[in-house]
């Protein structure tokens, strides 16, 4: 295993010995990303009209989370050399010398295979196949290729982070319907303005690490224009669940106000281009974009899971 790691990744020499504990291995799984995956997959389960055994649902959510963590672990294994250079990632377990790269690779591969097999046995093989595709797409297509090859890295790579609602729906129904597809598209279109806002502030870090993020390749002004363009697409897309009948009054209000706020903040980023004001505007959009996505999916969860759904047509009835 060590020879494979050594031949593939320059991170091989970062740590001669491991002194990592359980917390360090858990950190390899990117717990915050795992939490978001659990949440969005749960919403994907909830927006369907079908039901699933609670035990199967719980096991499935756990396996989806483990699969997401496994892909994060493989990402950290591959990117350990880059993480060692960037200020916000240099304390991660591998560059910090707490866990050896070969250990991280073995850990990630074991969790990947185990989570896919368990999800297939607990739920169905469509859900397991989608999880396997998600892991492979993030760990191989994004981490090993796109991230260091193109400024469109997070645009294309964002598909991996957008798939959990589709996996959740597949767990319950054995298929993927319009609901899962729309939730996928919302997260997919949300990803570029979210990450590019951060990249505007951290462009120096990315440049030092040799990562071709949009601000470093196309320039800050072009990035700002693209942020506005994606947000203009995201705002109406966020209302699609209402138009398709699985988002109600609560969701519609959250999507409308949240979309307008996203637009306002993206325009601030566009107009504030220099000094502390520029960084403040970018971080403001970055922070609010997280809240926006959380509120959107929370509204769907409240309506469908807690019985609070009221159709928008009631306003005109």
UniProtKB/Swiss-Prot annotation:
Keywords per UniProt: Cell inner membrane, Cell membrane, Heme biosynthesis, Membrane, Transferase, Transmembrane, Transmembrane helix
Catalytic reaction equation(s): heme b + (2E,6E)-farnesyl diphosphate + H2O = Fe(II)-heme o + diphosphate
GO MF term set: protoheme IX farnesyltransferase activity
EC nos: 2.5.1.141
Transmembrane segments: 25-45, 54-74, 126-146, 154-174, 181-201, 227-244, 249-271, 281-301
Membrane topology term: Multi-pass membrane protein
CDD domains registered for this protein in UniProt: PT_UbiA_Cox10
Main location per the UniProt record: membrane
Location of this chain's protein in the cell: Cell inner membrane
Entry-linked InterPro entries: Protohaem_IX_farnesylTrfase, UbiA_prenyltransferase, UbiA_sf
GO CC, any one term: plasma membrane
Pathway: Porphyrin-containing compound metabolism; heme O biosynthesis; heme O from protoheme: step 1/1
An annotated GO BP: heme O biosynthetic process
Note: Carbon 2 of the heme B porphyrin ring is defined according to the Fischer nomenclature.
Role according to the record: Converts heme B (protoheme IX) to heme O by substitution of the vinyl group on carbon 2 of heme B porphyrin ring with a hydroxyethyl farnesyl side group.
Alphabetized NCBIfam families for the sequence: cyoE_ctaB (TIGR01473), PRK04375.1-2 (NF003349)
Homology family: Belongs to the UbiA prenyltransferase family. Protoheme IX farnesyltransferase subfamily.
Record's protein name: Protoheme IX farnesyltransferase
Organism expressing this protein natively: Methylobacterium sp. (strain 4-46)
Gene, per the UniProt record: ctaB
């Amino acid at each position: 295993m060590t020879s494979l790691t050594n031949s593939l990744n320059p991170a091989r020499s970062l740590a001669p010995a491991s002194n990592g504990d359980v917390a360090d291995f858990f950190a390899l799984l990117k717990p915050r990303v795992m939490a978001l995956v659990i949440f969005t997959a749960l919403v994907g389960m909830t927006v369907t009209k079908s039901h699933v055994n609670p035990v199967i649902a719980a096991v499935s959510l756990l396996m989806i989370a483990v699969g997401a963590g496994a892909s994060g672990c493989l990402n950290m294994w591959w990117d350990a050399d880059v993480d060692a250079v960037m200020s916000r990632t240099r304390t991660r377990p591998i560059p910090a010398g707490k866990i050896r790269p070969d250990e991280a690779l073995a850990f990630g591969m074991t969790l990947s295979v185990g989570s896919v097999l368990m999800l297939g046995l607990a739920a169905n093989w469509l859900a397991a196949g989608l999880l396997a595709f998600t892991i492979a797409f993030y760990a191989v297509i994004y981490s090993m290729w796109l991230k260091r090859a193109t400024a469109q890295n997070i645009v294309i790579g964002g598909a991996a982070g957008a798939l959990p609602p589709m996996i959740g729906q597949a767990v319950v129904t054995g298929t993927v319907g319009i609901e899962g597809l729309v939730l996928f598209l919302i997260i997919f279109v949300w990803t570029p303005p979210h990450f590019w806002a951060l990249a505007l502030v951290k462009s120096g870090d990315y440049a030092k690490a040799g990562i071709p993020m949009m601000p470093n390749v196309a320039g800050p002004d072009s990035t700002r224009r693209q942020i506005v363009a994606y947000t203009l697409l995201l705002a109406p897309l966020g209302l699609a669940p209402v138009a398709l009948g699985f988002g109600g009054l609560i969701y519609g209000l959250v999507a409308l106000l949240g979309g307008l706020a996203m637009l306002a903040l993206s325009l601030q980023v566009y107009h504030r281009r220099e000094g502390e004001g520029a960084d403040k505007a970018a971080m403001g959009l970055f922070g609010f974009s997280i809240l926006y996505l959380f509120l959107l999916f929370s509204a769907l969860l409240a309506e469908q899971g807690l019985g609070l759904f009221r159709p928008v047509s009631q306003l005109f009835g």
